[in-house]
């Protein structure tokens, strides 16, 4: 079930370095929210705070709150691993497990999180591959290595792996940046389908992509070099690209910087 994310007063650190500062926003369920902004503005860091992946980096910590349908993801006693089951992630470069078959790649998270009969696993793997629009391309070679697929197919395999555990939210960190235009189109079409089931947040440097796939867009920027990233503006995507409220947003979208 897709869930709403409410962020309030979020500041993230890596050791003594303040990466982002005082971010507050809401991500609506069953929608696509795009994060845009120049390199180094903190959009990927912020994305990672939404499922506590930033804590994998030594010294990663936050102040503020992230609520998933009123559940505090940073509350006392909350297991980060359980958070990542609810809030899945797809990374910039396709990263199928290289020694695993296509089937085992999709089933990996399921096996980690519980005990399933083979028939149950087969049913979920098929459903997930169909959900990622990959089933018809791989159904006759499920025992072959996932690393043998094309780049676009590998990324869809990673999406199938992420949705197999039925998360509430799906985070995507530049999921098309390493793909060719045809594969990018396939992923964008898939995002449009997945938002019917999941809350989706995507980081992208491609503003045309943000305009195509998202319902809402958030623009991040730095006040100055060496300063933490900040959320400058968030609104309906159509408004952000046609009539932004902040001059810096218009300057970035029009190509004056970034």
Curated annotation (Swiss-Prot):
Q: GO cellular component terms?
A: plasma membrane
Instruction: Provide the coiled-coil residue spans.
Output: none
Biological process per Gene Ontology, one example term: phosphate ion transmembrane transport
- For the keyword Transport, the answer is yes
Q: Does Cytoplasm appear among the keywords?
A: no
A single GO molecular-function term is: ATPase-coupled phosphate ion transmembrane transporter activity
Q: Which reaction does it catalyse?
A: phosphate(out) + ATP + H2O = ADP + 2 phosphate(in) + H(+)
InterPro entries in UniProt: AAA+_ATPase, ABC_transporter-like_ATP-bd, ABC_transporter-like_CS, P-loop_NTPase, PstB-like
Q: Which UniProt keywords apply?
A: ATP-binding, Cell membrane, Membrane, Nucleotide-binding, Phosphate transport, Translocase, Transport
Instruction: Tell me how this protein sits in the membrane.
Output: Peripheral membrane protein
Assembly state and interactors? The complex is composed of two ATP-binding proteins (PstB), two transmembrane proteins (PstC and PstA) and a solute-binding protein (PstS).
The job of this chain, per UniProt, is described as: Part of the ABC transporter complex PstSACB involved in phosphate import. Responsible for energy coupling to the transport system.
Q: What is this protein called?
A: Phosphate import ATP-binding protein PstB
Q: Which organism is it from?
A: Streptomyces avermitilis (strain ATCC 31267 / DSM 46492 / JCM 5070 / NBRC 14893 / NCIMB 12804 / NRRL 8165 / MA-4680)
